[in-house]
């Protein structure tokens, strides 16, 4: 048998990561680069993606940046079109506004739906169009990875709109997987639990919230961004070549209950 560890490599592949400036997106960009991919980092904040790209280059990798708000569809389409070849999309940009269902404003509803669903859909569409331009796509392969959440599989208090958006991504994953299975492009979702990022640390400043989260996770801890990135690298690589239309749940057992 050939060296199976080589199936986890992404040499000669090009990946785009949205929301790549911090947290999970940044970890995914660095992880993909470590696996050999040439990485495009997309985010609204230049300083953050420039720093991440510099770290990749310092380690001997290839990185490019694209300053872009993915909710600006024309700008996003131009940015994706400017990538010469694309093999992997990590559709990561998204956010949450935790609040009780009866207090959700139309403004917050629209903000979450616009970024987490509409923009995610259109980014995936632009990426798929770019991938299909490659004449050898079926043999070369490709992967579109939607950053979902454990909240795309369950529900939770004060997260009604967020759950709506992540359940939508799970449905999109399955529908896209069926359309692209014969074209060489796999489509998967990555569904992490709460992950220790600057955003989580802000929420966990309330001891009762941190206790609730850790009490719900059978492994009794939140995730690390690198653990999510490891799942992304696997899902993007030939090691996952028979996987499509499903979700990699990285949740310490939350959804097993």
State each model region's role.
Residues 124, 165, 173:
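Active-site helix of classical SDR
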Residues 129, 178-179, 241:
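Alpha-helical segment proximal to the catalytic Tyr-Lys
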Residues 149:
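Residue(s) in the substrate-gating loop at a strand-loop-helix junction
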Residues 181, 186, 243-245:
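Short, small/polar-rich loop/turn modules that mediate ligand/substrate recognition or access, typified
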Residues 221-250, 255-256:
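C-terminal substrate-recognition "lid" of short-chain dehydrogenase/reductases
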């Amino acid at each position: 048998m050939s060296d199976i560890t080589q199936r986890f490599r992404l040499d000669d592949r090009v990946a785009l990561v949205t929301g790549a400036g911090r947290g999970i997106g940044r970890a995914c960009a660095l992880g993909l680069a470590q696996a050999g991919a040439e990485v495009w980092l997309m985010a609204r904040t230049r300083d953050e993606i420039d720093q991440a790209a510099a770290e990749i280059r310092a380690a001997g990798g290839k990185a490019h940046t694209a300053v872009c708000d993915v909710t600006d569809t024309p700008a996003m389409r131009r940015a994706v079109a400017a990538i010469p070849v694309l093999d992997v999309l990590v559709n990561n940009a998204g956010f949450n506004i935790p609040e009780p269902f009866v207090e959700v404003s139309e403004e917050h509803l629209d903000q979450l739906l616009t970024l987490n669903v509409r923009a995610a859909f259109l980014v995936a569409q632009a990426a798929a169009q770019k991938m299909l331009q490659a004449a050898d796509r079926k043999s070369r392969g490709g992967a579109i990875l939607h950053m979902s959440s454990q909240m795309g599989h369950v529900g939770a208090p004060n997260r009604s709109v967020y759950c709506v958006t992540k359940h939508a991504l799970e449905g999109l994953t399955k529908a896209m997987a069926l359309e692209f299975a014969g074209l060489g492009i796999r489509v998967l979702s990555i569904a992490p639990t709460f992950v220790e990022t600057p955003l989580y640390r802000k929420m966990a400043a309330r001891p009762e919230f941190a206790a609730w989260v850790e009490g719900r996770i059978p492994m009794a801890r939140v995730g690390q961004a690198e653990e999510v990135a490891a799942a992304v690298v696997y899902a993007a690589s030939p090691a996952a070549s028979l996987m499509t239309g499903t979700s990699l749940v990285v949740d310490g057992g939350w959804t097993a209950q």
